[in-house]
Amino acid sequence: MKPTLFISDLHLEDAVPGRTGWLAAFLAGPATEASALYILGDLFEFWIGDDALSPTAQHVAKGLGALGAQGVKTFFMHGNRDFLVGEKYAGLAGMELLPEELVIDLHGTPTLLLHGDSLCTDDVEYQAMRRQVRNPDWQAGVLSLSIEERLQMAMQAREAS
């Protein structure tokens, strides 16, 4: 039986290329032996839209696409940093987007998948912000801004977190 692999919170960004190199080696090596790869959020340090692909995002899409071409199913769940990853990038990378919570059958065991930020239930302010950024209307409004404006918003959010 081929393994099912899970990764999360890599926080990839152009400024830290070593992490992207590690992921590339993983995708071209051990991951090729898997039946599926689940990415459970925060693959990227930030994501400002599928229309603003960084060199890192392009490199990752190529690696994930190559993995999918070898028959490994790849799934993506949004995190608190990359909640704007959309269908366009998912298609480019050969990933299937998942809902916020999902129960899968992991070799006969029901297994709940989620990004850990949903468990910060005592942090009322964070949960309110989380609901806002996951709202499709809010996301559409943000995505209607220029790339420069979205980048500035992302930098401000990173500084505040």
Task: Describe these PLM feature segments.
Residues 102, 109-111, 117:
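Well-ordered beta-strand scaffold positions
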Residues 2-7, 12-106:
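Core catalytic region of metal-dependent phosphoesterases/phosphodiesterases
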Residues 114-161:
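Active-site-proximal loop/helix segment associated with metal-binding centers of metalloenzymes
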Residues 32, 64-65, 94, 109, ...:
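Short, charged/polar low-complexity linear motifs in solvent-exposed/disordered segments
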